[in-house]
Amino acid sequence: MNKCGDSIRVVHPLFQEEGGGSIPTSPLQLHIGEISSKQAILLNELWHSRMPRLDCYAVCKPCFAAEFENIFYAIAMWSLPIAANRLKNGKESLELRRMAIADDAPKNTASRMLKIMTMMIRKQRPDIKRLISYQDTGVHSGTIYAAAGWNPAHKGKYQTWGKHSKRPGQIEQSKSDKVRWEFTL
C-alpha cells in the first residue's frame, strides 16, 4: 500500500492547468473519465470503507475516476459479474465491483458518477444490456442507486462462499445482507 496517499490522487497532467487547487462544491464540477485498473485499485485502498483490498488488475474494466483540477475524488471499477452463470444473460452484464469516494468529494458525487458511467458504458459497449451492483446493507442504504435511476432487483441474506467453493481461502469481506441493484441499458 502506498504510504504517501496524497500523491496518487494527483492526475499528473503534461502541462499545469490554471486553477488554485480549490475543492469542488458540486458534483457537476467533476470530470468523469476512464483510468487504469492499477490506478483505481490504489485509490480504492485509500477511500473504500469496508473492502479496500482488491486484486483484479486484469479483470476490472472499465475503471472510471472523477477529478477536478487534476485531483481525483472518486473511482469506480467494473467487471463481468462474478456470478454471471447464475444470472439470466449474465454475459451481457457488467458489475460495479467497487466504488470509493474521497471524504472531501462533494455531496452526491456517487449518484452523479453512476449516471455518467451509465451513459458512457451505453455508448462504448452496445453489447452490455444491464448493469448490476451489490449494496452492502451493513454500511449503505442504497440512496445512490435510487437517485441514479437504478432498481432494487433482489434482496439476499449473507451466504459464505463455503469450504466447498471454487474460491477456497477467500477472506469474507462482509457478512452483511446484500441488495442487488440493476439498471437496464
Would you name each region that the model predicts?
Residues 51-57, 61-62, 67, 83-85:
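An active-site-proximal beta-strand-loop segment
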Residues 1-15:
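Acyl-donor-binding surface of acyltransferase catalytic domains
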Residues 31-35, 75, 79-177:
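Acyl-donor binding region in acyl/amide transferases
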Residues 44, 59-77:
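Conserved beta-hairpin
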Residues 182-185:
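Short beta-strand-to-coil "C-cap" segments at the C-terminal boundary of structured domains/repeats
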Residues 12-58:
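Short amphipathic alpha-helix that is part of the acyltransferase structural core
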Residues 5-7, 26-27, 107-110:
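Short acidic/polar alpha-helix capping motifs at helix-coil junctions
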Residues 61, 176-180:
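Short hydrophobic/aromatic beta-strand or adjacent loop that forms the aromatic wall/cage
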